[in-house]
Amino acid sequence: CKQIFGIYEGLTNMKFIAEFCQNHNGDFKILERMVAEAAESGATHGKIQTIYSANLAFRPEFENGVMIGEKVLVIKRPYQMEYDRLKKLELSTKESEKFVKLCEKFQIIPMTTCFARENLNEIADVGFGAIKIASYDCASFPMIREIADRFTDIVISTGATYDSEIKKACDILAGCDFELLHCVTQYPTSLNSMNLSRIPWLRQFTPRVGLSDHSLVSRDNVWACKAALYLGATSLERHFTVLPPDKTKDGPVSISSTHLR
């Protein structure tokens, strides 16, 4: 029986997605370490992101951000700075192919998040065993339809999504092997904002519901993940790193192999 976060019972079919995101800093050697350590620590899936700077859209409101009093309505993320940042983090098609083979070597399932419909051919050709639809694409219905036609292991995140959009996405995926992830798109997410009661609520759409956890590791450890398991979560996703927390953008919300064990 698989152990995840020190819990054994009922985890035989448990899925743990080690989200490598951009924690490799564009260095494939670091990504190789991440795959090895995640696999050795109990992960069932290793996930990267198929994201390219060329797909980045210019949005004027992000240039300076939008504030209402002390509340952030739109974050400040200038286009050119974000373009340059993403460009340094891109993995080539050949590197994605190497990643898939590396995951297979370590007997974990290679997975990616698709951020643009035009990249689906590449993802299919590379041979990813599973695909994730990000929260902000839960309402990208044309892309979801194409994914439903082409992939057999689908995970869809539900942060920043209206309930009606979740229902429509699930209607499109009816008949597919898919799983929902409860997610709060806040980095980091406080435990008070985790809203784990959404996990049983989401089961009206599918019996397979998990948690994508973005809590602050130094403050909240893996408590949200453990609580989700006791609520019957069938999968967990966490950002994963082999570097110190201050060395990557998502480092503070990323666990290490020590946490996973």
Each language-model region and where it sits:
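Catalytic cores and adjacent flexible loops of soluble metabolic enzymes
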Residues: 1-261
